[in-house]
């Protein structure tokens, strides 16, 4: 895919300083760090190296990446690294994709209590799947799953939901056998939805009772226990959105899919159309359109575009990818070996191409743009240092 001509970094560099001044005191430290990281990514501010071709006289400078998990430019290499690490976990079984979505009324609470409510979303979604799968009426097995949190819709609005990838089966209670689910069917979504709703609302009530929720502005009145309890009443009667997508075509397709989902950010640079002092335009999918092309162009005031990007910054240290059940980090290796033995399956050896467009990664040196030869590093320089070479930046040389 060709490099985009416009980036979120351009918006931040051009209009970020004014945004920070106008919203001083209303931006938290993680948001400020993300803005700074995105602005400085692959610029001289972060240092870098000079690479020279081994066949011709071409040289170019590659500036370091910020490696921030919210940076649109830094996710390709991170996704590839993650995918390679997960290759050995693949099993020769069907894989299912289950999505848990929070209602709008809960999403509002989540926005003001990100760590607490997003954490509860992970916990209750996993508990729901583990409980229903363990029930002999459904599967009667101990399953495993990988969950990925997304907090955005296509228009960058706040829309928290959890993507859960689950192998189609699990270990028997005594661990002596593999229990496969029915072909093409995992678990009943209505049963999942009802249990998820109950577990989540119970957990949310506990968070409120123990003083772990904070409310401000339009939600300030929810600090009152009586008003908060009344607020949850209607949510107990509405249907919560839990749906299961059809199984993947192959275990390898799971990784290709996951690598696109695990390290996504609120918007990719390729979706940007234009950016001016007053307006930013970008492509988005309008799912209200039932037929034909869903893609539309949205134009937002520049301040609103930046605000929408920043509402998806996660709290420091919060893990947006989690493994549960037999895929939990502490037991995964042993459980995978046991399951492979039960299925008489060999370890996965399918190769995966680890492509990266990150020129600052010494392990992912791009070929010479002039002759296609191999590039090698001849000089490195730190933040604040000026390279001795007068070669152009990699983006201009490529």
What annotation goes with each model-predicted range?
Residues 1-398:
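Beta->alpha loop/short-helix hinge microenvironment recognizer with preference
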């Amino acid at each position: 895919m060709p490099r985009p001509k416009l980036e979120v970094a351009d918006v931040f560099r051009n209009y970020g300083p004014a945004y920070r001044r106008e919203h001083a005191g209303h931006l938290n430290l993680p948001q400020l760090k993300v803005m700074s990281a995105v602005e400085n990514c692959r610029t001289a501010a972060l240092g870098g190296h000079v690479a020279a071709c081994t066949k011709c006289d071409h040289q170019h400078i590659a500036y370091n990446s910020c490696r921030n998990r919210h940076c649109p430019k830094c996710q390709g290499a991170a996704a590839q690294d993650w995918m390679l690490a997960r290759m050995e976990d693949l099993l020769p079984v069907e894989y299912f994709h289950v999505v848990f979505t929070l209602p709008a009324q809960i999403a509002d609470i989540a926005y003001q209590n990100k760590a607490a409510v997003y954490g509860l979303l992970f916990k209750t979604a996993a508990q729901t799947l583990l409980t229903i799968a363990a029930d002999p009426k459904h599967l009667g097995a101990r399953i495993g799953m990988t969950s990925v949190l997304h907090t955005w819709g296509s228009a960058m609005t706040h829309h928290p939901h959890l993507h859960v990838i689950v192998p189609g089966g699990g270990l028997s209670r005594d661990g002596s056998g593999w229990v496969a689910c029915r072909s093409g069917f995992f678990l009943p979504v209505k049963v999942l939805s009802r249990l998820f709703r109950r577990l989540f609302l119970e957990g949310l009530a506990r968070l409120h009772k123990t003083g772990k929720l904070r409310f401000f502005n339009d939600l300030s009145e929810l600090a009152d226990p009586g008003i908060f309890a009344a607020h949850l009443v209607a949510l107990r009667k509405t249907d919560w959105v839990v749906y299961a997508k059809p199984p993947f075509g192959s275990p390898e397709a799971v990784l290709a899919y996951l690598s696109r989902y695990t390290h996504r950010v609120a918007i990719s640079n390729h979706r940007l159309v234009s950016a001016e002092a007053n307006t930013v335009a970008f492509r988005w999918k309008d799912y209200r359109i039932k037929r034909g092309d869903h893609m539309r162009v949205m134009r937002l005031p520049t301040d609103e575009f930046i605000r929408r990007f920043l509402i998806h910054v996660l709290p420091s240290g919060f893990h947006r990818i989690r493994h549960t059940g037999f895929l939990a980090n502490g037991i995964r290796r042993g459980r995978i070996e046991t399951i492979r033995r039960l299925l008489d399956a060999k370890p996965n050896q399918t190769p995966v191409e680890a492509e990266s467009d990150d020129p600052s990664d010494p392990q992912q040196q791009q070929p010479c743009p002039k002759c296609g030869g191999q590039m090698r590093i001849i000089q490195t320089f730190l933040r604040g240092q000026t390279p001795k070479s007068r070669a152009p930046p990699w983006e201009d040389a490529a």
